Curated annotation (Swiss-Prot):
Its cofactor is Fe cation. It is an enzyme of class 1 (oxidoreductase). It catalyses: homogentisate + O2 = 4-maleylacetoacetate + H(+). Belongs to the homogentisate dioxygenase family. Gene3D superfamilies: Jelly Rolls. This is Homogentisate 1,2-dioxygenase. Pathway: Amino-acid degradation; L-phenylalanine degradation; acetoacetate and fumarate from L-phenylalanine: step 4/6. Hexamer; dimer of trimers. GO terms for molecular function: homogentisate 1,2-dioxygenase activity; iron ion binding. It comes from the Bacteria. Residues 16-40 are annotated as: Disordered. Fe cation binds at residues 337, 343, 373. One of its GO terms (cellular component) is cytoplasm.
């Protein structure tokens, strides 16, 4: 929360391009030329590969980076079990999957001294982390910067800030994410989160499955949606710190801790494509109708985690960014829907065009597969009678985690005080308008 951290965050340099083969060195000459693991790595460093995919996965899907570090990652004492806090991991068996529509207000204020990891609160998810399938929805609310380091062996983390800026100090370098931006931390990458404001709040998608990638564009063509060039990767930056550093590792659903005698954020140079990124959601190139009808929300996909069935995602990350609505003879808000996919929605700022009230920044809603949902009565009545002039939607930024499997809520989410008890009421006032004579 210091001014120094804010100044550091705002002055960062970056590499650009999602999925690129990046290379960076914090000290000239630290990156070996022409080979990955020379007999003696430059500057007395250790060469180490971090694999985000199996060695033999197809080249287009292969993720790995080579790190050149002061100490090898293997140089640490045994890990011991730590308290999981409010973090839960798939398979989710505390409650039964629920077909009811659910909506939550924002998380309550945490106790003083709560850092990013301590402020994680699991809402629910699906799949099995040990089988590398499925996902989890977490929220976070923190009021203290981390003085420990965290890594997640169970999946990659898509962090969606809603309030308060974050400075992520990773093995690859530093990244800065504000509300309206997202940060993607690959599986196994160590990092620490500094808060840039008095507190920070937001959402996290923990993806146990295939790494997120840009969606195929099909008939859209070569351009549109999220552009690869707008994703920012860090330049190398390292900590040369001797002394006790706590490292927390999430492994098969549990937290484990060890005290290193040095900082593990000691990578002086690196190259590869298994790297963290940030992305500004306002750069999303929104596509939509210029004739009639509301397009399916897949047109708003930023990133997708593919499954073994083409087009059927383990999880999609979708954003409803500022856009124009111009459809003629069209009900312009999102339509009434029953979906084979399950949808968790969150709100970063403003309002969402399908809900007049109750869906607030920091809150969220869950509509499991085949659970009917759509605009509330006020939105339906207003949109059905609206004059169809071109309309700019620029007062809100909502997103969705959409997944192929039902999302089972955790016990803490199903019983939370901030769970709205009467969410179904938003649809109860919808009137009968049927007139057979028409």
């Amino acid at each position: 929360m210091s001014g120094d951290a804010r100044k550091t965050a705002e002055g960062l340099a970056h590499l650009t391009g999602f999925g690129n083969e990046h290379a960076s060195e914090a000290v000239p000459g630290a990156l070996p030329e022409g080979r990955n693991s020379p007999q003696r790595a430059p500057l007395g460093l250790y060469a180490e590969q971090l694999s985000g995919s199996a060695f033999t996965e197809p080249r287009a899907h292969n993720r790995r980076s080579w790190l050149y570090r002061i100490r090898p990652s293997a140089a640490h004492p045994p890990f011991t079990r730590a308290d999981n806090g409010a973090i839960r991991t798939a398979p989710f068996t505390e409650t039964a999957p629920d077909p009811n529509r659910l909506r939550w207000n924002p998380l309550p204020e945490p106790p003083a001294g709560t850092d990013f990891v301590g402020g994680l609160w699991t809402l629910g998810g699906n799949g099995d982390a040990t089988q590398r399938t499925g996902m989890a929805v977490h929220l976070y609310h923190a009021n203290s910067s981390m003085d420990r380091v965290f890594s997640d062996a169970d999946g990659e983390l898509l962090i969606v800030p809603e309030r308060g800026g974050l400075l992520l100090r990773t093995e690859f370098g530093l990244l800065h994410a504000e509300p309206g931006q997202v940060a993607l931390v690959p599986r196994g990458v160590r990092f620490r989160v500094d808060l840039l404001d008095e507190s920070a709040r937001g959402y996290v998608c923990e993806n146990y499955g295939a790494p997120f990638q840009l969606p195929d564009l099909g008939p859209i063509g070569a351009n549109g949606l999220a552009a690869a060039r707008d994703f920012k990767a860090p330049v190398a930056a390292y900590e040369d710190v001797e002394g006790p550093v706590e490292v927390v590792n999430k492994f098969c659903g549990n937290l484990w801790t060890a005290t290193y005698d040095h900082s593990p954020l000691d990578v002086v140079a690196w190259h590869g494509n298994h790297v963290p990124y940030t992305y500004d959601l306002r750069r999303f190139n929104v596509l939509g109708t210029i004739s009639y009808d509301h397009p399916d929300p897949s047109i708003f996909t930023v990133l997708t985690s593919p499954s073994d069935t083409p087009g059927l995602a383990g999880v999609d990350f979708v954003v409803f960014a500022p856009r124009w609505l111009v459809g003629e003879d069209t009900f312009r808000p999102p339509y009434f829907h029953r979906n084979v996919m399950s949808e968790y929605m969150g709100l970063i700022e403003g309002a969402y065009d399908a809900k007049a009230a109750g869906f607030v920044p920091g809150g969220g809603s869950l509509h499991n597969m085949m659970s009917a949902h759509g605009p509330d009565r006020e939105t339906f009545d207003r949109a059905s009678a609206a004059e169809l002039r071109p309309q700019k939607i620029d007062d809100g930024l909502a997103f969705m985690f959409e997944t192929r499997w039902p999302v089972t809520a955790t016990a803490q989410a199903a019983r939370a005080e901030h769970l709205q008890p009467a969410y179904d009421d938003v649809w109860q006032g919808l009137q009968r308008h049927f007139r057979p004579s028409d």
